[in-house]
Structure formats: C-alpha cells, structure tokens
C-alpha cells in the first residue's frame, strides 16, 4: 500500500491519534490492569478482522498503541521503496481501535504520546551500521530495516531507531530526537528553557527545533 504523509494524515481526522516519526500513536487511560487486558483482547479481535494489529504497551493506568505498516511503498523518481510507514490499512485499524475504546468508555490522552529516536553523525554509515545493528538488536538484519537508508531498527520493535546524519565536525556525534504532538510542542520547549536549556536552531520549527543543555549537548524536539 502507498505510504501516507502530512495532509493525507491530517484529512483522516483521527482525533485520538498523533503521527510521530513513522507511525500513528495513541494512549488510552484505564482504571486497572484488568480493564487494560479486556481492551487489548478486544483490539485483538478488531485486528484479526482487518488482518493487521497494533503494537501494544500496557503501563500503570494506560495502554499505549502504535500502528504502522511494514510494507508501505513510496516512489523516489523511478525507484520504489518499501518502508515502515503509515498506510490506509493503519488508518482503518486506528478508526477501529477508536470505536473499541469508545464502546468500553475509555478516554484517549493523545497529548501524552511521544517517540524517541537516536541520531549519529557519520560519513561512513554503510561501514558502521552493521556494528550498531548487532550491538543494539543482536541482529544484522536491523540495518536498513523498513528504510531506504542504513538506519538501524530493531526487528522486534523494542528499541529506539538509530539513524545516521551527515558528519559535521562537532564534538557531539550522538543526539536524541524526541517526537511530541504538535499541541504540546511549545509547552515542552518552554519547559526545556525553564530548566536551563537553550534554543540553538529553530530555523525549521516547529517541525525540528535544536536545543542544548548547559554543557552544550544538543537534542532535537520534533513534531511529525
């Protein structure tokens, strides 16, 4: 299926969900673990009906969900790439999940979802990616998984993705990308500044804002 991007996702009007990095994310609040289990069981049935299922994390008082397709396609010139991204299948699953949550009287908390990725600046991603793939995931297949680049992704979805950027000559080569919903971006940025951080580069804001701590270590606040 075709990968869906910005305007297409916005037109879907999935009020319980937020696009972060490659997938759609949602959080539903639950009173107890048993309620979480019942919710997830119902999601299993909904997913079976569509032949597609979410990734699920159960925590104290919440159920976190991510929907993404492993076989999304997009065209770059004459080349067709198969990637991990959102497709129509994911929109259909997200709507079905929203219906299940409504039937169980669960409340969505979309402003609380987040996604973390790691970045490493290098001029030799093809050379070093195999090392990071086996170190992080234990599997060489993590290199380029669901991506046309050398990006490292855990085949089992346990770890943050590691992507490779251009070498800049700066002493810090690792940095963290934090994806947040658009409606909490300003609040999160203000909290960083209030804690002593500084804005280093907001030329691509609100999509990307580079911030730094008091020692000059940088991170990137992202809105997908």
PLM features: residue spans?
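Vicinal oxygen chelate
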Residues: 68, 75, 84-88, 107-110, 115-123, 169-189, 209-212, ...
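A cross-kingdom feature marking charged/low-complexity
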Residues: 2-3, 61-110
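Amphipathic alpha-helical segments
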Residues: 32-43, 126-139, 188-193
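N-terminal beta-strand motif that seeds the catalytic metal site of vicinal oxygen chelate
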Residues: 102, 106-127
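A common structural junction motif
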Residues: 44-54, 100-104, 136-140, 194-200
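Hydrophobic, helix-prone linear segments
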Residues: 1-35, 49, 63-64, 70-71
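Short, flexible turn/loop "capping" segments at secondary-structure junctions
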Residues: 17-21, 110-111, 168-171
């Amino acid at each position: 299926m075709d990968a869906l991007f910005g305007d297409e996702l916005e037109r879907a009007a999935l009020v319980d969900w937020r696009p972060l990095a490659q997938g759609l994310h949602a959080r539903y609040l639950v009173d107890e673990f048993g309620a979480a289990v019942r919710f997830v069981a119902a999601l299993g049935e909904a997913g079976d009906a569509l032949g597609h299922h979410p990734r699920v994390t159960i925590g104290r008082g919440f159920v976190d969900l991510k929907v993404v397709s492993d076989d999304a396609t997009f065209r770059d010139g004459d080349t067709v790439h198969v990637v991990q991204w959102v497709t129509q299948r994911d929109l259909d699953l997200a709507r079905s999940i929203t219906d299940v949550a409504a039937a169980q009287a669960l409340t969505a908390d979309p402003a609380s979802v987040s996604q973390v990725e790691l970045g490493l600046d290098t001029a030799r991603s093809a050379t070093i990616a195999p090392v990071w793939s086996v170190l992080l995931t234990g599997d060489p297949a993590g290199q380029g998984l669901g991506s046309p680049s050398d990006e490292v992704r855990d085949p089992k979805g346990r770890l943050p993705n590691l992507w490779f950027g251009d070498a800049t000559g700066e002493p810090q080569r690792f940095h963290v990308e934090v994806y947040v919903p658009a409606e909490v971006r300003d609040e999160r940025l203000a909290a960083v500044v209030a804690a002593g951080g500084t804005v280093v580069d907001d030329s691509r804001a609100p999509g990307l804002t580079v911030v730094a701590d008091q020692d000059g270590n940088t991170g990137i606040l992202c809105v997908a």
